[in-house]
């Protein structure tokens, strides 16, 4: 029994028959033939394009084509259209001869002719104005075999046999590899390619191979760019009918796929399948490199880049490369200044959705992250993580250069710049560079002269909030920073830190020129002038210059002619 061919579903006209059809009938015929051809191509049945299809696509008459092989000389004249028709018995006889010729092994008894058109004269479609002969041929030929059990009609006798298997419930084709069974040998053959990895269908355009011809046919649309499936609601076009079906649910709001576990509904069955893994914990996608498993194929694809080290996404602006396209998209906003994520409450824009999410907490006042140890709540998860270290006392971040440890990674990153000398934050006004962005922000105030921090007690203004905080202690007399060694108290933590060196003899400031160590950075700065020979402090009276301001002050007493330091206990002579 031969496979299904285009000629099995095609009807051809002579020139005389073609002229009997009006324009609507011709268009209908053309649409049906082209649709039949496309369906066969989709199923991978048609390899080369028939001449009939070429003529129809070009809008030509099918007059050059030979009439279908089963058509004999007409013997009856149609009274409606002056068209030659066969008597009904001639139709049946001709079809039976053709079927027996093509299905010799089946036997005459196994073939049941479907009575699709009892009489040519009684054919309803013919009376409505369609070609009676070809309608009868189409009706008779397209549904030739009938199932005795359900009355279902089939095009070929082989389809009848396939259908009968459904009644028996048998799956004669079973695969030993996975135990899966099939009721058709063709489905069984296709399934085997999953295990063998065979991909016999190759795209001529790009070389990509597929294990099914239907997949290749679908793939080819990528190269042609054809989008023949159009949405009637919005006009959007798609290259696959399945994509159009999925798209239509946007307009209808339909979500037919419901999760039995939690009741959540979805537009697509594939999304439901993926969603179910949340409940089952299934992770079907495994990395061959390290064995790690993933719930989603996309997550595995993203993970694989870790092993290859590939960074295929490159920024055209600065040349920086990224593992993922999403990271490149996010990075580009640095150059464009784009802030697509806008707060509906205050209108402020953000580059990243995560930043907007954090920002929204300002308006809600929500503190969703709570410490289990002490109950303190935080706005951000990172703040909670940082807080937890207070309870553990751990300092997990260690400087490899000097061994200093930190509770958080960010202070370690800043600390490392002391060793590297890196100063990535540069002032556009004067070119001065800084190791921290906060220091640059503070520095910029020098150029603007702005002093936004004002003391409520005396009205004095400061360009830094830290300076205002220190100043306020003058009014309060507060000295919160106490030395554990000697009990001395200080207004500022920095002064306490400096003071502690008296007890420890720590000299962290080293001269690169001679290696001498100093307790204070100011002392090191003065010392460096010995090597440079610089004397920036000049006397206005005589022009003599000094290395330090204190030396200048002592010198100026000479010009004053006085002895400013007088002992009150010494008696006058």
Swiss-Prot record:
Family, per entry: Belongs to the krueppel C2H2-type zinc-finger protein family.
Keywords carried by this UniProt record: DNA-binding, Metal-binding, Nucleus, Repeat, Transcription, Transcription regulation, Zinc, Zinc-finger
Pfam families in the record: KRAB, zf-C2H2
Zinc finger (C2H2-type): 145-167, 171-195, 201-223, 229-251, 257-279, 285-307, 313-335, 341-363, 369-391, 397-419, 425-447, 453-475, 481-503, 509-531, 537-559
UniProt-recorded name of the protein: Zinc finger protein 66
Domain spans labelled KRAB: 4-75
Function of the protein: May be involved in transcriptional regulation.
């Amino acid at each position: 029994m031969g496979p299904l061919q285009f000629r099995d579903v095609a009807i051809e006209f002579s020139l005389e028959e073609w002229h009997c059809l009006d324009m609507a009938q011709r268009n209908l015929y053309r649409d049906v033939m082209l649709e039949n051809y496309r369906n066969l191509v989709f199923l991978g049945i048609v390899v080369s394009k028939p001449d009939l299809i070429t003529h129809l696509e070009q809008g030509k008459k099918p007059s050059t084509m030979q009439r279908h092989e089963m058509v004999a000389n007409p013997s009856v004249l149609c009274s409606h259209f002056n068209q030659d028709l066969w008597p009904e018995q001639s139709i049946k006889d001709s079809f039976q001869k053709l079927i027996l010729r093509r299905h010799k092994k089946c036997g005459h008894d196994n073939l049941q002719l479907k009575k699709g058109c009892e009489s040519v004269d009684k054919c309803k479609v013919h009376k409505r104005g369609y070609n009676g002969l070809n309608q009868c041929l189409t009706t008779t030929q397209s549904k030739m075999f009938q199932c005795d059990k359900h009355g279902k009609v089939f095009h070929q006798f082989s389809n009848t046999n396939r259908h009968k298997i459904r009644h028996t419930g048998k799956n004669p084709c079973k695969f030993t590899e996975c135990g899966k069974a099939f009721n058709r040998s063709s489905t069984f053959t296709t399934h085997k390619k999953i295990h063998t990895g065979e991909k016999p269908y190759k795209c001529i355009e790009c070389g990509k191979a597929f294990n099914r011809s239907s997949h290749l046919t679908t793939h080819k649309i990528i190269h042609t760019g054809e989008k023949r499936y159009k949405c009637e609601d919005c006009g959007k076009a798609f290259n696959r009918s399945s994509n159009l079906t999925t798209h239509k649910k946007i307009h209808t709001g339909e979500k037919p796929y419901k999760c039995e576990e939690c009741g959540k509904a979805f537009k697509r069955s594939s999304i439901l399948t993926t969603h179910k893994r949340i409940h089952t914990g299934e992770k079907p996608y495994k990395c061959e490199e390290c064995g790690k498993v993933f719930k989603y194929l996309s997550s595995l694809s993203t993970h694989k880049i870790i092993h290859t080290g590939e960074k295929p996404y490159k920024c055209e602006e600065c040349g920086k490369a990224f593992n993922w396209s999403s990271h490149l998209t996010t990075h580009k906003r640095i150059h464009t200044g784009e802030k697509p994520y806008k707060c509906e409450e205050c209108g402020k824009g953000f580059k990243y959705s995560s930043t907007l999410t954090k920002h929204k907490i300002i308006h809600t006042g929500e503190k969703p992250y709570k410490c289990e140890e002490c109950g303190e709540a935080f706005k951000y998860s990172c703040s909670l993580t940082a807080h937890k270290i207070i309870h553990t006392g751990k300092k997990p971040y260690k400087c490899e250069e000097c061994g200093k440890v930190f509770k958080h990674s960010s202070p370690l990153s800043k600390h490392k710049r002391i060793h590297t000398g890196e100063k990535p934050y540069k002032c556009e006004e004067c070119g001065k560079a800084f190791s921290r962005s906060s220091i640059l922000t503070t520095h910029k105030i020098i150029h603007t002269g702005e002093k936004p921090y004002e003391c409520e007690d005396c009205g004095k203004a400061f360009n830094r909030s830290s300076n205002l905080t220190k100043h306020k202690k003058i009014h309060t007399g507060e000295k919160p920073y106490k030395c554990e060694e000697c009990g001395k108290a200080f207004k500022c933590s920095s002064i306490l830190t400096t003071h502690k060196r008296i007890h420890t003899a720590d000299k962290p400031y080293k001269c690169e020129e001679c290696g001498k160590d100093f307790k204070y950075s100011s002392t090191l700065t003065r010392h460096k002038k010995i090597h440079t020979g610089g004397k920036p402090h000049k006397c206005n009276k005589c022009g003599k210059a000094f290395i330090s301001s204190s030396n200048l002050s002592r010198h100026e007493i000479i010009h004053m002619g006085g002895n400013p330091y007088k002992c009150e206990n010494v008696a006058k002579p």
